[in-house]
Structure formats: C-alpha cells, structure tokens
C-alpha cells in the first residue's frame, strides 16, 4: 500500500523563520519550522522573482522536478508557493549544510580519500537515478551536495536541470534519448568541454565530467582554475583575501612535497570522468561498479570522521558572513571585469595529470594571439606534451597574460613588466611576514607557550616588537603634547 504523502501548508503564516543559513544572488535559504506539522524543522529557499535570472516557468520547472523525483539521495521539495514577489520552496533541512561549506570551513586542503568515496558514491546514486528518469542536473558541484547529521547525502538545486528526453519509445521505434541540449548552463569551474562549446550539443556525460571536477574539489579543497583574472585583480585578491587564484601553486606544490597521496583506483576513476571525448566517459551506472567504490565505507564512517566535530549549518553560515565582512566587498568594477573574462576566456580543453590528480585548463587563443606559431614555439609545444612536469608559466599562474605571451617553457614572460610584479610581490611577502610575526606574538601572549623558531623568525618578531613599542611611545608622546596644550 502506498504511503500517504504529507501535505505541507501553502501559507507563509504556517512557517516560523528561525535564521538565515544561505544566500545567493537571487535567493536566500532559511531554517524554519512548520507549525502545523508539530514544529517540524524545514529549509525554505526564498527566490526573489525580480532578481532571478530564470523566468517563473523555469523556477516552476525546478520545483516540479524536485517534487516528482523520489530517491533517498535526491532533495525533494515538500511544496512551493509565492509570498509577495518571492517564490518559497519548502524542503527538508540538512543540518550539516553543503559539502562545499564543510570542506571550506574544516578541510581546506581536501577530505580524506576514504571519506570522499562515501560522499561521491551517494552522489553518484543520485545522478544515476536522475539519468534513468531522463534528467540532466547540469550543475553538479560540492555546493549542491547537502549532508545531514546522520551522514545522509542529497543532491540539490535543480535550477538548471533539464529533461533531455521522455523515457518512452517514440512511434519511429527509437527513443529520443539521443537528443542533445545546446544551451549553456551550470557553473564555469565545473563545465564539461562540450558544454562550453555548446553548439556541438551535449548529453548525460556532461554530468559525469562535473562529477569528476567535484571529486577534485573534494580532494584538493577547491575546483581547478577555470579563468584567469588580470594582474591587478590577482594582486588585489591575494592582498584582500589570501585566496590565491593560481590554483596550481597550492595544489601541485603540495603534491610535490608528498602531502597528498591518492590511490590508483581514485586517480583512474577521476581520469575516466575527465575524458575529453564524452563518448569515452562511463555512464553513472557503470561508474558505480568501478573498483574505487568497491570497498566504500558506510555513512557512520563519515559521521565519526567528518561530521561529529563540525559546526552546524547556521554557525558555518554566520562564520562565513563574518569572514566576508572582515575582508570587505570586492570592487564592483573588478567583479564586472572578472565576469567579462569568464565570458571571453572560457576553457577550450583540459590537461589531466592522473599521476598527481591535477587538472590544468587550456584556453582558446585570443584575437591578439598570433595565428601562426614559429618553429621554436611549435617545438616547445611538442616538448610540453611529452613532459608532464613542465614549468608553470605566468599564463598558467593567472597573471593576466595571453597564451602567446606565456609560451616560453623556462618561465620567461614576453610583453610583461616582470620587475613591477616582482616588486609588488616582494612588498606583499614582507607584509605577510610582519603579519605572521604579529600573530605569533599574540599567540605566545595568550597561550604562554613559546614555539621553536628559526633565527630569521626570531629577528622578525624582535623587529615587530620594537615597532609596536615605538608606535606606543609615539602615541604616549602625542597624548602628552595634547594634554600640555590643553592644560
């Protein structure tokens, strides 16, 4: 006998908002209780219809998709209704938030591999179900994978999902599963090559690519670089946030030191997902049979090793908002500039190094790039293909260079003010060293413990202490002078 579906009220008065737990460009997510349902805790996604890029029909499609799908790894919508100029979507509350928030708050260098396998297998179950139902998700990433305190994992956010076919046989005797989508949707970091070049069309395998990028995101703590900000923007971001845009510096550097080791099965699985040719990528169903998932742990394992010590979703959101406010908002011009670069500098391909689980983007040549390469450049290009451990050039490091300007394999950059950049980076390095010294002084003062330091670090701290004392004396002198004048 079918179980009766709970009927949630379609009235805002029936819900009591507790706190905000997420925010986006056109939507906010709240923790709330449904009063008529014995104060059941729910999540409410409030979409501003005036701010949303999607039209009302698209939003209705999202909520319809969420309500019709039934799978333990899919986040269902209980109901949806309009409140003033907002669409409220009532959903289950996932107390640990998204995998993105978990990784960024507690595992910035990436999750342990045995935990990654659990999260990925649960997500893959959801993708397999979606594809069986004729749906592409089109925006698979850690931010759309939600986790509850019991370890349950649910794939969410169907704002850009699409039905690629009706799972029935047409009158001609062939299914319409061969239909391919051509509109661009999703987040640039996770976009499959065929989605970027959407004029060629794409299908279910685009989700498999995004799944592979998500695996890298969980392994390294962030997705691979997808666009190159200009030099000014890069330096500004380094100074303001210390969130380096040059992904390869952080990841390949740590790999060389041996800090991150990945099993052969994991590397092979990711490699299959990141095949350039979508026809060579396995289906979600086939991928579930890969050896990487064979000895996968249970949900209780991630509860014990990942979730038990985490802050809850509302605390993580509050902490993230405090961090954002502390570093200040980015300049609007910079954001517009970066958006334009994302638009105009889409990736044309990827170079995947399976040995250290790294993915480097390849960008199409710009108008300023020469259409013909010199023999020397062609030789260098051949060398680069033969050597997996080539020197990272200024282009790859995100210094705002064109592809042509960064061809030199020895790191030499043409048409680039190297001295100016070096000068700015040295100033930044010095500033960071002084900040580190100050932090060490504060830690020592609060804890009473003395860390083992190198001679250079001791000298830096000594200089910093003298500076602080000098600043204090200056303030005392100024106050004394002011008092004498007033007296």
Swiss-Prot record:
> What would be one Gene Ontology cellular-component term for the protein?
cytosol
In residue numbers, the region (Disordered) covers: 363-389
Which PANTHER family does the protein's record reference?
SERINE/THREONINE-PROTEIN KINASE FRAY2, SERINE_THREONINE-PROTEIN KINASE BLUS1
Q: What is this protein called?
A: Serine/threonine-protein kinase BLUS1
**Sorted alphabetically, which Gene3D superfamilies does this protein's record hold?**
Phosphorylase Kinase, domain 1, Transferase(Phosphotransferase) domain 1
Q: Does the keyword ATP-binding apply?
A: yes
Instruction: Tell me which family the UniProt entry assigns to this protein.
Output: Belongs to the protein kinase superfamily. STE Ser/Thr protein kinase family. STE20 subfamily.
Could you say which cofactors this protein requires?
Answer: Mg(2+)
Please state what class of enzyme this protein is.
Answer: transferase
Q: What's the name of its gene?
A: BLUS1
Give the record's PTM text: Phosphorylated at Ser-348 by both PHOT1 and PHOT2.
A GO BP term here is: regulation of stomatal opening
Provide the function of this protein: Ser/Thr protein kinase mediating a primary step for phototropin signaling in guard cells. Essential for stomatal opening.
């Amino acid at each position: 006998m079918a179980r009766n579906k709970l009927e949630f009220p379609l009235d805002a008065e029936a819900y009591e908002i507790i706190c905000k737990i997420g925010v986006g460009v056109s939507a906010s997510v709240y923790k709330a209780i449904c009063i008529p349902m014995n104060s059941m805790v729910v999540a409410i996604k409030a979409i501003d219809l005036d701010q949303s890029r999607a039209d009302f029909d698209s939003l209705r499609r999202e909520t319809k998709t969420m309500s019709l799908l039934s799978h333990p790894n899919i986040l269902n919508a209980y109901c949806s209704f309009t409140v003033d100029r907002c669409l409220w979507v009532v959903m289950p509350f996932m107390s640990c938030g998204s995998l993105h928030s978990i990784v960024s708050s507690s595992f910035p260098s990436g999750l342990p591999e045995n935990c990654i396998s659990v999260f990925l297998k649960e997500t893959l179950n959801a993708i397999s179900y979606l594809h069986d139902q004729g749906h592409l998700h089109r925006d698979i990433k850690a931010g759309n994978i939600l986790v509850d305190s019991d370890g349950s994992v649910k794939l969410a956010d169907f704002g850009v999902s699409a039905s690629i076919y009706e799972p029935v046989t047409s009158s001609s005797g062939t299914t319409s599963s061969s239909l391919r989508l051509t509109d661009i949707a999703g987040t640039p970091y996770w976009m499959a090559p065929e989605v970027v070049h959407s004029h060629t069309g794409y299908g279910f395998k685009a989700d498999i690519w995004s799944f592979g990028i998500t695996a890298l995101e969980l392994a390294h703590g962030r997705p691979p670089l997808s666009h190159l900000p200009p030099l000014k923007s890069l330096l500004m971001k380094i100074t303001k946030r210390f969130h380096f845009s040059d992904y390869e510096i952080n990841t390949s550097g740590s790999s060389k030191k041996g800090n991150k080791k990945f099993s052969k099965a994991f590397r092979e699985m990711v490699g299959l997902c990141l095949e350039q040719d979508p026809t060579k990528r396995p289906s979600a169903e086939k991928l579930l049979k890969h050896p990487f998932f064979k000895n996968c742990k249970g949900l209780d394992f991630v509860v014990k090793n990942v979730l038990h010590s985490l802050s809850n979703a509302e605390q993580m959101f509050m902490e993230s908002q405090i961090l954002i406010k502390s570093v200040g908002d980015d300049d609007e011009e910079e954001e517009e500039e970066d958006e334009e670069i994302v638009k105009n500098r889409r990736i044309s391909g990827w170079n995947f190094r399976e040995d250290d689980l790294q993915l480097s983007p390849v960008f199409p040549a710009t108008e300023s790039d020469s259409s013909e390469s010199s023999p020397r450049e062609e030789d260098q290009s051949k060398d680069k293909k033969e050597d997996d451990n080539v020197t990272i050039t200024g282009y790859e490091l995100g210094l705002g260079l064109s592809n042509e300007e960064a061809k030199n394999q020895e790191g030499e950059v043409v048409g680039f003010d190297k001295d100016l950049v070096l000068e700015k980076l040295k100033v930044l390095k010095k500033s960071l060293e002084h900040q580190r010294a100050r932090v060490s002084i504060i830690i020592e003062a609060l804890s009473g413990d003395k860390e083992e330091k190198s001679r250079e670090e001791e000298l830096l701290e000594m200089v910093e202490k003298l500076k602080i004392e000098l600043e204090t004396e200056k303030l005392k002198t100024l106050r004394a002078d002011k008092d004498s004048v007033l007296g």
